[in-house]
């Protein structure tokens, strides 16, 4: 690469020397020349020259020339800027030629310009940027969008329009928005086209998309060349075309595409800003052009609406008439950038002069040695203050017709944004915007800059687009190539479990469960898929599935169809469809019947359940005794008798055979709730015990993967599957312990012989295979432990294949319609359906966790009943206690006690006596106390009356 760069620079230097020989001028002194006229170096010059380098006869050039003229008039008429200094503009035509453009740039340098507006062409920009670097003259390009015009390589090249780096990222986001994976790039084969498409390819790669083909044609290609190019890309798979060409010749592409039938349904055409430049320049719009372009999506540099912009567009007709241009030369966005570029130079000069800087030029000392050769380069002067002037330009920050004019550290305009337009029969219609701040939106970008940056996929939004063929639904974006090549399908040539995939004599050449699912999914696709099945393997042993996946990734096969397991390592090389059957690794081991245990009757409950249940029986007996003791003679008597009664009553409720009757309301309520709990416990115990005694109990030495790893005994795996690598790499099992087995017969033989007979202790394989194995073994074996990987089988396609997405959708549709189950029953129905796992008695045990809600309800009822009982007893005790003396009451009142009557002493011994008394006795005592109080009250009244009579009159 360095060699080619060196050759290019040498060639460029030689060309510059040849061009300079076109004029030979007297040698001037090497001293500095002041640009000012009749003034000292410290005063402002009376005029300053600015160059303009562009192609006159082009859509962009015609609009730019009007903008340049308007800008110069406005600047010189504005007394607030460049006071006393006139700005002159020197035009130079590049004629779309690198040679002529370079010559024109040198002629501009002859006029001692302080800056040059242009060039229009990116190719010319690469050449003349070397001139700018040498002579320190800033070039401000309003139309060269090539992203490789680097600010590091070309420090004096400044872009006042947007960098195509952002436009290519916008197109990439558009492709990603519709989930397309491949595009065809059609571009002009020059610096502008090649470099822009190169950036597009890099941007697509970041989104897991790609350019499937780059279709380049030379500048100025005729329709015949374009037709041959489009005919070749039409044979390819992708139907997404990104067109990046020049506006003056780009419409020919769509004219040819229309004749080839490439503008109909299923096609997607995306263009960069060139198309809207061409259409905007047509006044009025050509109906024939719109007819060609219906459904095309085009990008355009976004410029915010403003009063100044509207006023400038309103002047356009007068400007065109003044310059005697054709009536159909319309306004386009590059006119705005050209206008702003001139104003940028003027404003920068104003700041430059206000800082006390001057404009001076000097001869280039590096060109002195060329004088003796006869080639005179003395008119190429260095702008001495060019570096400072460039810095002033980069520091400018104001609002122009194109929006905020400010440059970032990479010398790009800030806030890049684009319009997205859909071409319809009535003209272009905006469907949204793109900016690097928010991605796609339907609101103008400047209204979103105040919000945080957000480019997440879920927040992207565009309005409805009408695609070619007047289709509303977004096209799929690809078809099968029209070059006659069918889909190459690799099918594993299995020697075992042939009902999944195997060789056959039918027209397809293969058959099986996986083949039927693939064929059923293919039939659901809305397009034909030519295909051919190719067996993979020698038929003597199962092939390596990892090798099959590698051949798909290497483009030997387009897809692998069969019992291919989806695992992480394989997804790095291929794309899998939605799984069509669940799978996972399990352990199969020999089993034998277990002997019945004499303690089986204890197995229905866990130890915790037995303990909690026993405690509850005792507790309910105590609660019933407390509630019934005062009412029921059966719960009274000597302490020994009462303890026996509590125990007997508690456990007899288990069988609903308690002989004691409950009398109190609270006791009956508690017993009712408890009997319901007992009913549930009894029923659950009976059901669990029945299951334990009736289900066949099987045992195995191997309880799962953990015991298998610890046993150091041989393990069998199916030859060709990923199980071997999983055991070795993930579980760190020694390879010497793993024995590959070829078919079902070897499986059964190895399990029956066992480790001592040269067999295996267990087999590790995928679940679908194990179901078939257990059925064919008459259920002599069982899986032990749990399934320790969970995955599935899918079809493996090449990376980024769009067919994988469509097939996944078809598989989901098969599942929803029940067709997957029908195919499964056709191929995977076995004579003996075996229970997969060994039944464990622990699975039938009932724990406290299953009953904690019921026990909680029971406890709450008991608590409420005991609370009501205690409240009643305390109330009775308060009424039966002896009356306190008046002196105690008086002392309490004098002390101001807040508790008042609550200071009465409570004797625990007296309280227990009240609790132990019969309810009838308590009621009798309360009645007697009430009568006594009544009599005492009457006596007090009589005594007071007698005292009143004895009082002297």
UniProtKB/Swiss-Prot annotation:
It is a multi-pass membrane protein. Pfam families: ANF_receptor, Lig_chan, Lig_chan-Glu_bd. Glycans are attached at residues 38, 95, 223, 371, 397, 436, 454, 569. Residues 1-29 form the signal peptide. CDD domains: GluR_Plant, PBP1_GABAb_receptor_plant. GO terms for molecular function: calcium channel activity; glutamate receptor activity; ligand-gated monoatomic ion channel activity. It is found in: Membrane. The gene is GLR3.5. The keyword Ion transport applies. Expressed predominantly in roots. Also detected in shoots. The chain crosses the membrane at residues 607-627, 637-657, 669-689, 851-871. The keyword Membrane applies. Residues 628-636, 658-668, 872-953 are cytoplasmic. InterPro entries: ANF_lig-bd_rcpt, GABAb_receptor_plant_PBP1, Glu/Gly-bd, Ionotropic_Glu_rcpt, Iontro_rcpt_C, Iontropic_Glu_rcpt_pln, Peripla_BP_I. Residues 30-606, 690-850 are extracellular. GO terms for cellular component: plasma membrane. Keywords: Glycoprotein, Ion channel, Ion transport, Ligand-gated ion channel, Membrane, Receptor, Signal, Transmembrane, Transmembrane helix, Transport. Belongs to the glutamate-gated ion channel (TC 1.A.10.1) family. SUPFAM superfamilies: Periplasmic binding protein-like I, Periplasmic binding protein-like II. It comes from Arabidopsis thaliana (Mouse-ear cress). SMART domains: PBPe. Residues 928-953 are annotated as: Disordered. This is Glutamate receptor 3.5. Glutamate-gated receptor that probably acts as a non-selective cation channel. May be involved in light-signal transduction and calcium homeostasis via the regulation of calcium influx into cells.
